[in-house]
């Protein structure tokens, strides 16, 4: 009642599914009542930005189609972001979550018709898929299949992992001159720089680096997340010990840079390691750099030249 009286809108909504039986399985016995409450709020003019956590065997396939169809009939649901279930090795309920090509393609094939319909009718796709679906569906040709920049509008769902890859690609491609210059600097200084990535970046940034003029000098080093396991593969969730083990043996004459997204505001990774801890454990000097492409390219040049 307070939401309606104060017209607190738009709100964030975890929708997940629409069929009562599926909602009971996923959310609990009282879950069906949530749709009744949602419809009351929608009727009162409250708007929502919705999210669906897609879970294999629960709310994908036909259930996803039903959910999207129902939601599209309610204009108050402004948009929907779909993200895959995340899981670690420290549980036994899930062993996969659209990690393979076929499963990820099935999701894309389910969602694309609704995106095209919404684009034609409303002028924007309305439902957006997390980057993981495209990365998993096109491991060897992601750059050829990634949605264009305009697909993501103002990137409202960036924090949900929707459009991050496209942003990184656009930034990289806008830095062509900067990359040419950095390639010259690295060659002149006879320097090699290893940039740490999570496995999720292999189809995108790792490939871009391998095709850039800095190839062989600015080297992507993809690190597996052994600490969490499962399908946890983004750079921001990398743990210090995994990185330390991955960089052991790198020459002291080379450089290793870590994106600052690995660290919290106090300078710790998720396994409570600092930059100094990573250096001491690996025996290799490491430097933290920005996540923005033009910024970290400039910081790498400063690191190598020494000013």
Q: Where do the PLM segments sit?
A:
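Conserved Radical SAM active-site core
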Residues: 1-75, 86-114
